[in-house]
Amino acid sequence: MEHLLSMEHLSNSEIYDLITIACQFKSGERPLPQFNGQYVSNLFFENSTRTKCSFEMAEQKLGLKLINFETSTSSVKKGESLYDTCKTLESIGVDLLVIRHSQNSYYEELDQLNIPIANAGDGSGQHPTQSLLDIMTIYEEYGSFEGLNILICGDIKNSRVARSNYHSLTSLGANVMFSSPKEWVDNTLEAPYVEIDEVIDKVDIVMLLRVQHERHGISGEANFAAEEYHQQFGLTQARYDKLKEEAIVMHPAPVNRGVEIKSELVEAPKSRIFKQMENGMYLRMAVISALLQ
């Protein structure tokens, strides 16, 4: 695998290969490759806890040496372009770049680089490692994707997770549907929009999305009514109680407790939210291994 940029660039067989490797790392069946003497740099131009820290943990477990990069103290503050920043790191011997950026498809500007890129999120475009860890979590639960009914609720228009998961899960045979306020509908995605209360007792997976305040502008955030949103589109106790016995709840996090999901349900028996985070490290180990081997 040359790069990991978008779920649309991965075949189903490549997806299965990556989650199989990740599951084997997790179970201990597969010995960890050690990339001693190879260097990685994580370039995060947007805030991150889970993605950044799990990439760092994955890199350390694989023996990579981390070249620290902080946007606030870099020449980006002097106007250096993303390409020149990345080309500089390549020139000094970095072997892999992990990049999160607010610009959709930022990687299209980097096609002259000669080292692999792992996309850790581009604007509202794609978040392939999040999608892959979600797929891994679903696979551990169900063993397949064909015919699964998956409801994705929330800020569809601004969510790179919704976009990535829509493409990958439909390709794998799942039935994806959305529930969202009308102002956050994305008409470029062909999944049907439904009322959450009409399907909550029929779905296998409820995937909740964070409200993307940073992409709504000041007026959008000021006019947001958290309790009203929670009652209309969030996972309330009443909705949780209607879920099928074997259904699971997912969220890419960070979670706005009491908005997308009732706080007490974040760690309820059907929740796999922290399992997603655990799987993220193993999945990113699999991605790094595929990019460097």
UniProtKB/Swiss-Prot annotation:
Taxonomic superkingdom: Bacteria
DNA damage among keywords: no
Keyword Transferase: yes
Membrane-crossing residue ranges in chain numbering: none
Catalytic activity: carbamoyl phosphate + L-aspartate = N-carbamoyl-L-aspartate + phosphate + H(+)
Enzyme nomenclature, EC number: 2.1.3.2
Residues involved in carbamoyl phosphate binding: 50-51, 100, 127, 130, 253-254
The entry's keywords: Pyrimidine biosynthesis, Transferase
CC terms in the record's Gene Ontology section: cytosol
First-level EC class: transferase
GO molecular function, one term: aspartate carbamoyltransferase activity
Pathways per UniProt: Pyrimidine metabolism; UMP biosynthesis via de novo pathway; (S)-dihydroorotate from bicarbonate: step 2/3
Binding site for L-aspartate: 78, 160, 210
Biological process terms in GO annotation: 'de novo' pyrimidine nucleobase biosynthetic process; 'de novo' UMP biosynthetic process; amino acid metabolic process
Family assignment from sequence similarity: Belongs to the aspartate/ornithine carbamoyltransferase superfamily. ATCase family.
Record's subunit section: Heterododecamer (2C3:3R2) of six catalytic PyrB chains organized as two trimers (C3), and six regulatory PyrI chains organized as three dimers (R2).
Biological role: Catalyzes the condensation of carbamoyl phosphate and aspartate to form carbamoyl aspartate and inorganic phosphate, the committed step in the de novo pyrimidine nucleotide biosynthesis pathway.
Protein name, per record: Aspartate carbamoyltransferase catalytic subunit
Name of encoding gene: pyrB
